[in-house]
A protein has these predicted regions:
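ABC ATPase NBD coupling module
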Residues: 67-81
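H-loop/switch region of ABC-family ATPase nucleotide-binding domains
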Residues: 193-194
């Protein structure tokens, strides 16, 4: 049963300043949702709250499978993931970095290897699997972050500024990765981006953060 997310009346303030203000939305359909909005409008905050990294001050963040509410336990957390613009790298191979999410989830070795190799192929980094991750370019690092997330086959994938500070060539590669994931149609991807043209290229559903709320555009 596909995972759905409903947020309602979500409020979040930092140091007394409201960032999310009774923000509500239902992520019901598989595909790509693109969230745009000015700097500081709360996009990253919203992604962290949706990905269960942070809790709202008020309001509800509810995951459903069909019509059943799913408790926010480790099993649910294994089905969702957030990729941040500067992913943390470990001083080891590209393969080990991409395998990290699966290893902490206790994946079996053979299965882990298959999934990680597939994810590295998907993002065009398989030829670098034995290289030290610290030698990658910023575009490749961004792709490695996506591979690490894809290896766990998330049903809900949150990408925060996936092409921030990478060149046109790598932006195109990352966009193609996202479009290819979309073709597979198995997951929901929620992307925060400043780039309106990119939003148009990738999104099935366009969302705008405005005054602490999501507006569908
Ligand atoms: N952990 C935090 N502590 C204090 N203030 C925070 C924290 N996280 C976010 N903020 C503040 O909340 C507001 C919204 O920040 P957020 O990062 O969610 O916006 P954004 O839309 O992602 O911005 P950008 O486009 O620059 O990435 C900003 O004013 C930011 O300074
Ligand atoms: Mg942000």
């Amino acid at each position: 049963m596909s995972l759905r997310l409903n947020i309602s009346g979500v409020r979040k303030s930092y140091n007394g300043k409201p960032v999310l203000n009774a923000c509500s939305f239902s992520f019901d359909r598989n595909g790509v949702y693109v969230l745009t909005g000015s700097n500081g409008s709360g996009k990253s905050t919203l992604l962290r709250i949706c990905a269960l990294i942070e809790s709202p001050d008020n309001g509800e963040v509810i995951y459903f499978s069909g019509n059943n509410i799913i408790s926010k336990d480790i099993l649910l957390r294994r089905r969702i993931t957030l990729v941040l613009p500067g992913i943390g790298l470990f001083n080891t191979t590209v393969f080990n970095n991409a395998a990290y999410g699966l290893k902490i989830r206790g994946g079996k070795n053979k299965e882990t290897e298959r999934k990680v190799n597939n994810a590295l192929k998907f993002v065009g980094l398989i030829h670098k699997k034995n290289h030290n991750a610290l030698t990658l370019s910023s575009g490749e690092i961004q792709r490695l972050g996506i591979a690490r997330a894809m290896a766990i086959e998330p049903e809900m994938l949150f990408l925060d500024e996936p092409t921030a500070s990478i060149d046109n060539e790598n932006t195109e590669i990352v966009e193609n990765i996202i479009l290819n994931m979309k073709k597979e149609g198995r997951s929901k991807t929620i992307i925060a981006t400043h780039d309106m043209l990119q939003a148009g290229r990738l999104g099935d559903c366009m969302l705008l953060m405005d005054e602490g709320k999501i507006i569908k555009v």
